[in-house]
């Protein structure tokens, strides 16, 4: 299985840099096996059945991009350097691993000042990343970070425009609850409260799980033999209540439909033994063609990058040829791609 098998040509103008407004006006490609239909997200209730269960990732994206100044007293007088920081993940002590640019301009124990309220001290450097200790914690840290930080937009958006205040709402789901992600579970960005209410009124059920999406989600696959690729790890949690709800849906013969690849990867991690159980920890599950799905019956997801692990995941679910047809159709019909783009509802043909 070669990396080039998952490549395709994508016109630059199909890469979305802003979301559809309103959220539910985004287009929705519905694929039932080899049958493809064009719809819109607001019509999602018409494609689902009473008793279907949507599994939603309730992680909250933090404004992880910070710009600050390193101050240093020298023989020539006070000097400062502009420092850019992207927070990656916290450790058990509350310190943050971070990408620091330029890292060489900050010494161990030096302080970076981001605002009147927020500053951090460099405590260590490991594998090219800094370890930062902030002056605040808990709600105080969250408030100061929200004021000083910018949303960590994906590279394919950030290279086209800077993040702004709109992104603080656009790049956050309406049900975001547990802070810790540095990338959004983007399929969930299409939902608003009215759509959630309409789905519930139609008998669609919901379960919430948490997977803190990390910056590693944007890392390219660098090996030609995809089976040798090593996935990045991300922290996730499936509660006992969510596991029981999902199992009840399976036992009732109804469909479990994760919204987004993060929710899918998490429930398949928790369901490796055939039945989903309460689970918490770091998952590095890598789903590619040949994978046996134990939990997910379908998937709602956006359109993914060529040669990405997510292209491999949807190919595992739907079939390689089916995904080629889906993406050919999406390009021909000018669907918008990636995080702020349109959505797809993928329903595999079961034997």
From Swiss-Prot:
One of its GO terms (molecular function) is S-adenosylmethionine:tRNA ribosyltransferase-isomerase activity. It catalyses: 7-aminomethyl-7-carbaguanosine(34) in tRNA + S-adenosyl-L-methionine = epoxyqueuosine(34) in tRNA + adenine + L-methionine + 2 H(+). GO terms for biological process: queuosine biosynthetic process; tRNA wobble guanine modification. Its EC number is 2.4.99.17. It is found in: Cytoplasm. Pathway: tRNA modification; tRNA-queuosine biosynthesis. It holds the Pfam family Queuosine_synth. One of its GO terms (cellular component) is cytoplasm. InterPro entries: QueA, QueA_dom1, QueA_dom2, QueA_sf. Monomer. Belongs to the QueA family. This is S-adenosylmethionine:tRNA ribosyltransferase-isomerase.
